[in-house]
Amino acid sequence: MEAAKRNDLKTLKYLGKSLNVNAKNVHHRTALHYAVAGKNKEATQFLLQRRVKVDQKDKYGMAPIHLAAWFGSLEILKLLVQAGAEQKVENEEGLNIMHCAAINNHTEIVEYIINDMQMKELNKEDQSGHCPFALAAEHGSTEMLKILTEPYNMAAMKGDTPLHLAARNGHLDAVQLLLQIFDSRDEVNMDGETALYQAADNSQEECVLALLEAGCDPNILTVAKCSALHPVSESGDSSLVQLLLEYNAHTDVQNQRLQTALHLSAELGRTEVVEMLLKAGVDLEIRDRYIKIKKIQGKTALGVAARANEVIIVDMIIKAGRYYSWRKANPELNESVHSEHPLTFKLDHRNETKQLRSTAWRLAYELLKPRDWKRLAENWAFTKEQVAAIEDQWTGQHSYREHGHRMLLIWLHREELAQTNPSKQLYQELILTGNRKAADKIRTEAENTSKSCCIS
């Protein structure tokens, strides 16, 4: 077998009559398998002259003629045909020589099968329901797709079309060719998945873009009620989320568990995706599944994030909720409100807000009493759910400090966007909630800081 693998004709001849040409190894492969797989014409000819069994299958059902088609050796395939090899033989998966050639883009083999052997009947489905055309699409064999010109876009057993197979495996050239050949775009398989959904689910960004540009609908739901936005939000693929949003993917679609893309991304801590969805204006009031037996109320994305202990995302969602409530109450405002402060719900690390953030920290950790932050939150129209979500993280005797600090930073976010005077607002609210001592200290420190800046 080693001699056949190396095309070592001298050794094969030296072994002479003592050579058992039909000996098999543990994989049930003979020397002919290795000679053919290595595209070793001389060794193949020698073995055929010694009356080797040309149709011997290995443990996977692969005969030498399969290997000739698989590795694209037309000369050796012809030798095997002349030696009487079974031309319709199939392996354990139902693959014949045409399937093998199609998978590996060996167009000359397929042309020989169709034109010389006159065996178009080999153009049939394997055990998975895939015809050679579909297999060529699945493996990105674009030249093969061009010569298999029969105009069909047949679905396989699970309903996957060639476009599904090419898209989910990331074969951009094949996807583009199939889009040119066929008018169909949004066929679904048995799971209700389109080619676009499968491409997105497998993070094939180039294919997703090609399909979207060709007019594929990103909002077709699967049997599980998922749109293409669900799997990419769950996996945290922010570039694909952005791409789908640019092509009008609906943000508020609920799957079978009534989860939106925001529920999934919030629960798994996908901060970048959460930011994109919040900026897209996702509905924050949507609740996931209500469990009737346990009488458990469905949760909003905020509740899901709080349960998952995703502190940053909890604060982002509260900021978004307060921001959109403010915008709704002030419809006269337009996008110019973001000219100085671009919209973001992430943590604020800007130098120009450093003093205000320092004031918020001192107030929360050194000046406010345990229930003071809640009184401020109530005055600033924080909802009960928002307050509860803040309280879900951190417990203990001094946890109110962290809770108050987070609440103040969330409040500051909207004040900055509204372009108010946060220091003045804070002073007035502290007076209203009975914290004159804290208010005076904050104002005095702010004045001293201002004087220091002027002197310097």
Task: Please name every model-derived segment.
Residues 11, 42-43, 75-76, 108-109, ...:
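Conserved ankyrin/ankyrin-like repeat signature
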Residues 83, 87-174, 181-185:
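Solenoidal tandem-repeat scaffolds enriched in leucines and small polar residues
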Residues 151, 181, 214, 247, ...:
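Ankyrin-repeat-protein effector appendages
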Residues 25, 58, 91, 125-126, ...:
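Ankyrin repeat boundary/linker residues
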